[in-house]
UniProtKB/Swiss-Prot annotation:
Protein name: Hydrogenase-2 operon protein HybE
Protein species of origin: Escherichia coli (strain K12)
Classification via Pfam families: NiFe-hyd_HybE
Gene giving rise to this polypeptide: hybE
GO molecular function, one term: preprotein binding
Family in the record: Belongs to the HupJ family.
Gene Ontology biological process terms, A to Z: protein maturation
TM annotation in the entry: none
Length: 162
């Protein structure tokens, strides 16, 4: 019988915040690279393809995180396993983690360690901005010429004679 991780019917923001605050209090407080005044902050979570997606900043890192969503059953995975996911922002590599009392989750480090010059407000704004960016559709200029497939195969660029 395989174990499965049940999804969250509502946003896990409060549980994630409490779990990271406990980690900060219990085991991270004496590390030399910690941002001295950055509190744990969790962005709002957004449902994307059935999964809860957001970002978290702590005194030691800023990460994108994904938790199982409503009616989801994730297979139990090995902590530290790597998984590549295609998000609107692009392909990102996530690592399986586990928060005591919460769930397994996927995490992609965006910044570690944090700059000590970053204010609390800047850190929280950056966390919210990153949560929006990873789910933002990429914008391109349709008037910019693109190299065709043949040009890519044969080393030619747009505008060169074939």
């Amino acid at each position: 019988m395989t174990e499965e991780i049940a999804g969250f019917q509502t946003s896990p923001k409060a549980q994630v915040q409490a779990a990271f605050e406990e980690i900060a209090r219990r085991s991270m407080h004496d590390l030399s690279f910690l941002h001295p005044s950055m509190p744990v902050y969790v962005s709002d979570f957004t449902l994307f393809e059935g999964q809860w997606t957001g970002c978290v900043i702590t005194p030691w890192m800023l990460s994108a995180v994904i938790f199982p969503g409503p009616d989801q059953l994730w297979p139990l995975r090995k902590v530290s396993e790597k998984i590549g996911l295609q998000l609107p922002y692009g392909t990102m590599t996530f690592t399986v983690g586990e928060l005591d009392g919460v769930s397994q989750y996927l995490s992609c480090s965006l910044m570690s360690p944090l700059s000590h010059s970053m204010s609390i407000e800047e850190g929280q704004r950056l966390t919210d901005d990153c949560a929006r960016m990873i789910l933002s559709l990429p914008v391109t200029n349709p008037d910019v010429p693109h190299a065709g497939r043949r040009a890519l195969l044969f080393g030619r660029r747009s505008g060169e004679n074939a």
